[in-house]
């Protein structure tokens, strides 16, 4: 077939060269955005008198027809037409005649594709924010059910201090809240229009870029035509934000994997989110959590890939930028899928409160409570720390725990120890006393839950 840009060429490319250069196999995902962008563009052309109202109406009817066909997956794309833009333009001309060729007046594929991706990410970022809020709602429900579920808090994967399981869950709520905030802020950069920037230098036609942007639901235009067609920082920002979100999901999945093991037995995954072994009948593997953890590297790779593509590109457009899309599409699909799986996995998991409770009665995670006890009685904390360290050593040598040490032995270490010491050794009491802002104390958790519920309700309302 003859190319829409083929006027200055005398030889046709080999089929394998065409296939190598074509992007229609993946950029067809932009079909809705491409057609909607074209409808806005031709509407503007008519308003400015660049095409007649009759021509614009004919073009819009043709585009609306193609849009409906696209929604029903009835469009047939060709490699010969290279990309989504030329495929749609070719179909339009076939449908309505040569007047369809006027659609591209005052526009280049360079600003067209950038516009498509802005519209695509606008939609997808809003979807991801909503899905993240749904996951946060699941976290809130689990936290509400586990305010008084006591578990070990860890540093260096060693038991450190007793905490509420709700407090642990809510830590991820706030990480996700920052992820949502980052996505929301990125919409300021996504919701601007490159349309009308042309190939790189603008156009000689009297277009109205602000009007086109308004028709597309965007909040403004790029101020520089070179910048509009040549940068992909809005995609990089999306990939960066998605990498951080996936990192948070991956960290939580790592813990879920550990907690579901026989060594911990803190939780049990629903059968819906686990798999078995082809050889070992007893196995119940946390495959979905492992897959989310694994797919995190995939999203990181998409970020690093585009950063590497961009780092050496002179202004303005270069064909290298064709490589900006597949990683973006893949990241959207990956993040949406992981959020959906994560929400279901957390909603259906069983919490083994008894095992968590046992874990904080057979360790030394209450050692800090004794140091605080002495400090509250006026002893410098460093001296209190030294005394408690010796008490822990004494216990490990005897094979006992701090609660088993008789008061007489405590008094040998410090005369400040009294009978009330044993009250602070209870994990429940230890958690309850940590009532500083943002702490694991039950009162603080109730406050955090109220705030968290308010944030999720507000998001659902919007």
Swiss-Prot record:
It holds the Pfam family ASL_C2. One of its GO terms (biological process) is L-arginine biosynthetic process. InterPro entries: Arg_succ_lyase_C, Argininosuccinate_lyase, Fumarase/histidase_N, Fumarate_lyase_CS, Fumarate_lyase_fam, Fumarate_lyase_N, L-Aspartase-like. It is found in: Cytoplasm. It comes from the Bacteria. The keyword DNA repair does not apply. GO terms for cellular component: cytosol. GO terms for molecular function: argininosuccinate lyase activity. Its EC number is 4.3.2.1. It catalyses: 2-(N(omega)-L-arginino)succinate = fumarate + L-arginine. The keyword Metal-binding does not apply. Keywords: Amino-acid biosynthesis, Arginine biosynthesis, Cytoplasm, Lyase. Pathway: Amino-acid biosynthesis; L-arginine biosynthesis; L-arginine from L-ornithine and carbamoyl phosphate: step 3/3. Belongs to the lyase 1 family. Argininosuccinate lyase subfamily. HAMAP family: Arg_succ_lyase. This is Argininosuccinate lyase. It comes from Bacillus cereus (strain AH820).
